[in-house]
């Protein structure tokens, strides 16, 4: 009876896997395939299913078949302004945002052009309804109508560097730091003390 039960359970599990399974394929992308560089800093999948790959030698777009690389072109204002792409995010409405070593760039999927939004040192980037950036202990929000980054919050009296940002469903902005834990900023701008592992 045990054997019959085991065979029945095995049959059910195989049937369930077969009916729910998807064809998933995996490719190992290298410079031989067109990747601009082996060291990958960040990846992002846009609303069209395109994979964007940030490296130390430019931005790569992978459509499942081909890789196209975007790099700095001197004297071309529509090209990438910095080759080192550290982080990638997007608005799922035709814009891809890049944190580069020299600032923030925007790539328009429709026009296929880059726009430099901010030059200078930026430590973190995140998109959730708005583009948030972290510069040392300050968080800024991109104002699309003015083209400016407006101060959203300053962690007063703190000597920290923000490393990552995340906005949760309750509109709390979580701010990860390098060496100082995680801060939580509520929607009404109340900040909690650093969250440490106890």
Residue ranges: model-predicted function:
Residues 1-198:
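Carboxylate-rich, polar loop motifs that coordinate divalent cations or form catalytic acidic clusters
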